[in-house]
Design a protein with these regions (language model features):
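A short beta-strand/loop micro-motif in the catalytic core of glycosyltransferases
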Residues: 124-125, 145
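Short hydrophobic/aromatic-enriched beta-strand-loop microsegments
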Residues: 141-149, 163-165
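Catalytic nucleophile serine of serine hydrolases
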Residues: 128
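Compositionally biased, low-complexity intrinsically disordered regions
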Residues: 1-2
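Extended, subdomain-level signal for the structured scaffold at the beginning of enzyme domains
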Residues: 5-120, 124, 132-136, 152-181
Length: 181
């Protein structure tokens, strides 16, 4: 499972100490327009904690981030979303940005993959605008969710309770407002 005690900016454990996520496999799904820090920081921190982190995208290959109002750096995906199997991973991370989740929520493979993680009770972390994907997957009704403020109405309209906190954990769903929190 995805430990709740991870703090994004904690100093990495010394190499002589067992890493908290050693042996865990985490999947990040993204496409062009992902918020740069919302993919790179979780990838870096999870890797530092010992997790084997893979990135899946719509077409595989390079995807381009969005950083401070302009196109950012490319990141290379390890596999396509269609080739990813929830059974192979322990948790799922959904970076936000406006473009990334808006494109992914219209992709049936992406939504089916998110639903498969949920059906297995595996942790799903959704950052910023990524709760749009949870809404599209039908996972928010009756749940406590946070998100970037501009999609608060979407969260409420999906039947979720919007919580204005930096991070909200409700069962297997972990949501956060934005990278600045």
């Amino acid at each position: 499972v995805f430990p709740r005690h991870i703090v994004l900016y904690r100093k990495p454990a010394p190499m002589t100490q067992a890493l908290p996520l050693q042996g865990r496999k985490i999947l990040i799904i993204a496409t062009d327009g992902f918020e740069q820090s919302e993919l790179e920081v979780p990838h870096e921190r999870l890797t530092e904690e010992g997790a084997d982190v893979k990135i899946a995208s719509l077409e595989g290959g390079d995807i381009c981030g969005w950083d401070d109002g302009d196109w950012g750096e490319d990141v290379t995906a390890d596999l396509t979303i269609a080739a990813a199997n929830a059974a192979d991973y322990d948790a799922l991370v959904l970076p936000g940005g406006q473009i990334n989740p808006d494109m992914l929520r219209t992709d049936s493979d992406a939504i089916a993959l998110i639903q498969a993680f949920a059906a297995a009770g595996k942790p799903i972390a959704a950052i910023c605008h990524a709760p749009w994907l949870l809404i599209e997957a039908g996972l928010t009704k009756g749940r406590r969710i946070t998100s970037f403020e501009s999609i608060e109405t979407d969260v409420k309209n999906s039947g979720a309770t919007f919580v204005d906190e930096s991070v909200v954990v409700d069962g297997n769903l972990i949501t956060s407002r934005c990278p600045d929190d």
